């Protein structure tokens, strides 16, 4: 796999003609005779527009943010602006401006996040680049399964269960620190990102990367909490109660927004409880949508002579299924009888139907006295 740094180098080479012809006025979308106030106003608008916190995951926006900062760094400095107006961006990048060694005038630029902090927070920005706080990530969605019998799906059910989930550590209040104090990350100076400056001949390219030491938080823990060992979270049992409505569909899901695992550095994700139907305990009924199906076996005598009746236990204990045939009424093998209103509940729309599939079991042989049946058939 090609390292990210090499990918950035390749992209930089491809963008070389564009970078060499950089127009700082065009980047800030202002005229060449723009006043200091207009330059500052343009920077304020564009830096907020392209700030990484508002464009998470967009490399293009991150690059725009760096370009806008670079343009403002030059045009807001009278000396740099004068050199740029006379000799172009290359002269500024190669040290045409004044300044001490390693400073902005020594062929380099201020960190774009430092510029942003000075503009919006008077140089006292906290972690996260000065644009409020970094966008809080959401924790992962957690999906759990519970199994219900067909009867529970029919009648509705109340389910209670407990899950062992991550939650903020009570001992350190989610700080991960025994004394509750966090130190500024020395690698990124609390910004959460590191700006790498690549110089290739006359070209200068700035690349923003998440700080590996602090994981982008801008802070590190020096004195770890003894309970959570600096993880900021501990496992806790959480109780849940779910009401499954009568007639709920198979694979019914109840979503609890923001009730999954949570921590101080992210918002809790969603908990999804999915209800599956058990393979057993269906009392001989099968479900397809809002309708129920059942197979009833008849003897040859019942099928041919009729005169029988059956009472079958139903999913509703107060509502038995009654089947019958008058005498001399034949039931064919594979015949289907529809019992209206004995399907699954449909809320205000009533009930589905029950389909009885009859299977006739014939004897292997007939007795001599049954030969008259052959003549009738």
Swiss-Prot record:
Residues 1-21 form the signal peptide. The gene is SCJ1. This is DnaJ-related protein SCJ1. GO terms for biological process: ERAD pathway; protein folding in endoplasmic reticulum; protein refolding; protein transport; response to unfolded protein. It is found in: Endoplasmic reticulum lumen. A zinc finger (CR-type) spans 156-237. It comes from the Eukaryota. The keyword Endoplasmic reticulum applies. Present with 8260 molecules/cell in log phase SD medium.
